[in-house]
Amino acid sequence: MSTPKELRYSEEHEWVKTEGDKVRIGITDFAQSELGDIVFVELPEVGDEIKADEPFGSVESVKTVSELYAPINGKVVEVNEDLEDSPEFVNESPYEKAWMIVVEPSDASEIENLMTAGQYEDMIKED
């Protein structure tokens, strides 16, 4: 199970990567392994506002449909359209090819409230 140290993590198994004044968001390796084979990804539109702890999209696997929860507040500035045709990227490359959205945060300090890799690893061990 991969948990890159440079990322921050939410309790809902999303990861956040800071890139200048924007953040890239996706789901963790742990989340994709729990979901099984991903067959469909539904994401917001560019320009949509997302609110922390509220759904911004969903992933559908052969087992279930799971909502994606926003780890921070902000405005969607980019969406990974490759996932529309290749949802399997979520299983194959959750931290690289399968990023979900890029967001301009309303308040970048919210990122500091998310878990470090070590804290996230401790949380998933308890599950």
UniProtKB/Swiss-Prot annotation:
UniProt GO cellular component terms: cytosol; glycine cleavage complex
Key word Thylakoid present: no
Entry-linked Pfam families: GCV_H
Start and end residues of each Lipoyl-binding domain: 22-104
Cofactor note: Binds 1 lipoyl cofactor covalently.
GO biological process: glycine decarboxylation via glycine cleavage system
This protein's UniProt keywords: Lipoyl
Residues modified to N6-lipoyllysine: K63
InterPro entries reported for this sequence: 2-oxoA_DH_lipoyl-BS (IPR003016), Biotin_lipoyl (IPR000089), GCV_H (IPR002930), GCV_H/Fam206 (IPR033753), GCV_H_sub (IPR017453), Single_hybrid_motif (IPR011053)
Cofactors: (R)-lipoate
Signal peptide: none
Keyword Cytoplasm: no
Function recorded in the entry: The glycine cleavage system catalyzes the degradation of glycine. The H protein shuttles the methylamine group of glycine from the P protein to the T protein.
NCBIfam families assigned: gcvH (TIGR00527), PRK01202.1 (NF002270)
Binding partners and assembly: The glycine cleavage system is composed of four proteins: P, T, L and H.
Family statement: Belongs to the GcvH family.
Protein's name according to its UniProt entry: Glycine cleavage system H protein
Organism field: Bacillus licheniformis (strain ATCC 14580 / DSM 13 / JCM 2505 / CCUG 7422 / NBRC 12200 / NCIMB 9375 / NCTC 10341 / NRRL NRS-1264 / Gibson 46)
